[in-house]
C-alpha cells in the first residue's frame, strides 16, 4: 500500500480507512493478530483484512459491516491524528494548483505539522519530484518521518528539524515552489527566495489573520517577488430539489378561478450552514533576473 500508487490487496503494515457509514471513518494500521473495535463489532485484522481487496465490504462481530478503503491524501486528512491545526482538501487543492505542482516538482514546506499538506504534495509530485519539509518541533518532526515511512512515501520526502525563520530549508536554488504555514511567514521570505531556483518559482503562505497577510506581502514586495495575490476559499453547498408551483398569471383577462395545474422544476438553494473562514492564501512569483 502506498499513498502514491493504488494496490489491490491489503497487506500487513498497510494503513486502511474503515468507512463506518454516515461519514464516520477511522484509520487503522493493519497488523497480523490485531483487532479493531468498531460500533459494528470487532474487526480481526488477520481474518477480515489481510489478503482482501481494498474496497471490500467486511462483516464485523455484531453483524454490522464496514467498507475498507484504500488510503488517499484526502481520506488521510479527514482521519489523521491531529498534532496541530491542519489544512483541508479545499485549501490544499487551490495550493497545489496555484503552485503549479506536477510530477517532478521540487517543493520546500514549513511547518510539517500533522502532515496533511505534505501527503497531498507528495502524491502530486511523485514519482520524480521531492519534498523538503521543515518542522521546528522535534517530536512532531519524528512522528511525521515515521508516518511517511509507514505510508511508503519516504523516498519522496526529506524531513528536517530546525527553525525555518532562522535556518531556512537546508537547500538552496532547488525548489520549484515554497509553501509556508507558520505564525510569521514574513520572517522566512528571504529563505524562501534562496530555496527557489535561480530561474524562478512560486510561493504560497497560509495565514489565518489579515495582519499576517499584510506583513507577508510587504516582505515579499521588498524581497523582489511579483504577481502578489491573496485568496480566501469559502465553498457554498447547494441543496437541489424539485419544486412545484402553479403557472404564473400572465394577465390573459379570462374570468373564473385559476387552474389547479402545477409546473414542477428543479431548484438550487444555498444551505443555511456554510463553511466559515479558515485562512488566507497568499501567492507570489519569483522571476529570474
From Swiss-Prot:
EC number(s) recorded for this UniProt protein: 2.1.1.220, 2.1.1.-
Region feature (Disordered): 245-272
Catalytic reaction list: adenosine(58) in tRNA + S-adenosyl-L-methionine = N(1)-methyladenosine(58) in tRNA + S-adenosyl-L-homocysteine + H(+); an adenosine in mRNA + S-adenosyl-L-methionine = an N(1)-methyladenosine in mRNA + S-adenosyl-L-homocysteine + H(+)
Positions where N-acetylserine occurs in the chain: 2
GO BP terms in the entry: mRNA processing; tRNA methylation
Record-listed S-adenosyl-L-methionine binding positions: 87, 114-116, 135, 140, 163-164, 181
Signal sequence region: none
Gene3D superfamilies given in the database record: 3.10.330.20, Vaccinia Virus protein VP39
Modified residues (Phosphoserine): 263
Pfam family, one: GCD14
Coiled coil: none
Residues annotated to bind substrate: 20-22, 35-42, 64-65, 85-89, 110-117, 180-183, 205-212, 278
Domain of life: Eukaryota
Cell location: Nucleus
Family: Belongs to the class I-like SAM-binding methyltransferase superfamily. TRM61 family.
UniProt protein name: tRNA (adenine(58)-N(1))-methyltransferase catalytic subunit TRMT61A
Gene: TRMT61A
Amino acid at each position: 500500500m502506498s499513498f502514491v500508487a493504488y494496490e489491490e490487496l491489503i497487506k500487513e503494515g498497510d494503513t486502511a480507512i474503515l468507512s463506518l457509514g454516515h461519514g464516520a471513518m477511522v484509520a487503522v494500521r493493519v497488523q497480523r493478530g490485531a483487532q479493531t473495535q468498531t460500533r459494528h463489532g470487532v474487526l480481526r485484522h488477520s481474518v477480515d483484512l489481510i489478503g482482501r481487496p481494498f474496497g471490500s465490504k467486511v462483516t464485523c462481530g455484531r453483524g454490522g459491516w464496514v467498507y475498507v478503503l484504500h488510503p488517499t491524501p484526502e481520506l488521510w486528512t479527514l482521519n489523521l491524528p491531529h498534532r496541530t491545526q491542519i489544512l483541508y482538501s479545499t485549501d490544499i487543492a487551490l495550493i497545489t494548483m496555484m503552485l503549479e505542482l506536477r510530477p517532478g516538482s521540487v517543493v520546500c514546506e514549513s511547518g510539517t505539522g500533522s502532515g496533511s499538506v505534505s501527503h497531498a504534495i507528495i502524491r502530486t509530485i511523485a514519482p520524480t519530484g521531492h519534498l523538503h519539509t521543515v518542522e521546528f518541533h522535534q517530536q512532531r518532526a519524528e512522528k511525521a518521518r515515521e508516518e511517511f515511512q509507514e505510508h511508503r512515501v519516504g523516498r519522496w520526502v526529506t524531513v528536517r528539524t530546525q527553525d525555518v525563520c532562522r535556518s531556512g530549508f537546508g537547500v538552496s536554488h532547488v525548489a520549484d515552489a515554497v509553501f509556508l504555514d507558520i505564525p510569521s511567514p514574513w520572517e522566512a521570505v528571504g529563505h524562501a527566495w534562496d530555496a527557489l531556483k535561480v530561474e524562478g518559482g512560486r510561493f504560497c503562505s497560509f495565514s489565518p489573520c489579515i495582519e499576517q497577510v499584510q506583513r507577508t506581502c510587504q516582505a515579499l514586495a521588498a524581497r523582489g517577488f511579483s504577481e502578489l495575490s491573496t485568496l480566501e476559499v469559502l465553498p457554498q453547498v447547494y441543496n437541489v430539489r424539485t419544486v412545484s408551483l402553479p403557472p404564473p398569471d400572465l394577465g390573459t383577462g379570462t374570468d373564473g378561478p385559476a387552474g389547479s395545474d402545477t409546473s414542477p422544476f428543479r431548484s438550487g438553494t444555498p444551505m443555511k450552514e456554510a463553511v466559515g473562514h479558515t485562512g488566507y492564501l497568499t501567492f507570489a512569483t519569483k522571476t529570474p533576473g
